[in-house]
């Protein structure tokens, strides 16, 4: 069971211990959710994701 309600609320502000596996949120901590593609250097830990593509608009 996903400990976070990312897919329900659209937001995820989890701590480092969170293990979201089905996150479809638009604003979340990269350290918790996989909003951005794995290996995306522009989405550093703690960054707030804005999309699912690895580009300049990926995070804010």
Swiss-Prot record:
Segments for region (Beta): 1-28
Positions with a binding annotation for a divalent metal cation 4? 32-33, 43, 47
Per UniProt, the keywords (alphabetical) are: Metal-binding, Metal-thiolate cluster
Which GO-annotated molecular functions does the record name?
metal ion binding
| Pfam families for the chain | Metallothio (PF00131)
Residues annotated as binding a divalent metal cation 5: 33, 35-36, 49
Summarize where a divalent metal cation 6 binds, as residue positions.
36, 40, 43, 59
Q: Which amino acid positions bind a divalent metal cation 3, per UniProt?
A: 14, 18, 23, 28
Q: Which InterPro entries match?
A: Metalthion_dom_sf, Metalthion_dom_sf_vert, Metalthion_vert, Metalthion_vert_metal_BS
Entry binding sites for a divalent metal cation 2: 6, 12, 14, 25
* Source taxon at top rank: Eukaryota
> At which positions is a divalent metal cation 7 bound?
49, 54, 58-59
Extract the ranges annotated as region (Alpha). Answer: 29-60
Has UniProt tagged this entry with the keyword Metal-binding? Answer: yes
Amino acids binding a divalent metal cation 1: 4, 6, 20, 23
Q: What does this protein do?
A: Metallothioneins have a high content of cysteine residues that bind various heavy metals.
Q: What is known of its domains?
A: Class I metallothioneins contain 2 metal-binding domains: four divalent ions are chelated within cluster A of the alpha domain and are coordinated via cysteinyl thiolate bridges to 11 cysteine ligands. Cluster B, the corresponding region within the beta domain, can ligate three divalent ions to 9 cysteines.
Checking PANTHER family in the record gives:
METALLOTHIONEIN, METALLOTHIONEIN-1X
Give the record's family classification: Belongs to the metallothionein superfamily. Type 1 family.
Instruction: Give the protein name, as stated in the record.
Output: Metallothionein
Organism of this sequence? Pagrus major
